[in-house]
Amino acid sequence: MKSSDEKKVLFVSGRFPFPLHKGDQLVLFNNIRLVSQKYKVTLITFYDNESELENLHKIKKYCEKVVLIKRFAIFSYINIIFSLFRLEPMQVSYYRSGLFKKKLNLLLSVDRFDLIHVYMLRMAHYVKDIPTPKVIGLIDSMHLNMSRRVLNETGLKKAIFKYEEWLLKSYENNCTEWFDRSIVVSKIDKEYINNHNVKVIPVGV
């Protein structure tokens, strides 16, 4: 049984953890499950469609509170257009939401969290200026992933991906400075980011 003075951890995610189809969803779910054994957990996350919420009970089992914000694809694509003027990676702009920021700020105003755990680079900007101790699960280097994709593309698509790669390089390195610790799953990703606060924790550990 959890005590009333137990420490609180806030998880911030761009993707609902169920169904467990992708690696980052599995990492998020396992971390919530493990952290909930000793701490009170709150999750704030986007979801894309109602079918995902059929599994809501599976995550509520481990969370004191779950805050859900629906992500509408049309607004995400509009954000990508504006990213050209912000010099911001498209993958970051895709997940920008005034409603998400509002809900997050409300959570932070009514609860005192001892740690904020953000999942993926695309969500980092939401907590950039929050003084609470912060950890980001980068999972892997998005800059490295994009550089690999560039090699397999041609024409206009290659040019777009090359531009995104350039933006991600700067953004990813700056992002790690906003957090007390950044986590990746392999040494290759750590070396590519090359920041002193990056720690390697393989999947399943």
Residue ranges: model-predicted function:
Residues M1-L68, D111:
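N-terminal subdomain of nucleotide-sugar transferases
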Residues I188, G204:
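Carbohydrate-associated surface elements
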Residues G14, Y77-Y94, V135-S170:
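Acceptor-binding helix/loop patch of EC 2.4 sugar-transfer enzymes
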Residues N49-L56, Y126, K190-I193:
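Short, charged/polar "capping" segments at the starts of alpha-helices
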Residues N31, K102-L106, M142, K158-R181:
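Membrane-proximal helix-turn-helix segments that form the acceptor-binding/catalytic region
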Residues I116-H117, E177-S186:
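A short beta-strand/loop micro-motif in the catalytic core of glycosyltransferases
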Residues L104-M123, P133-V135:
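Short N-terminal targeting/anchoring amphipathic segment
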Residues F46-N105:
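A conserved catalytic-core segment of Leloir-type glycosyltransferases
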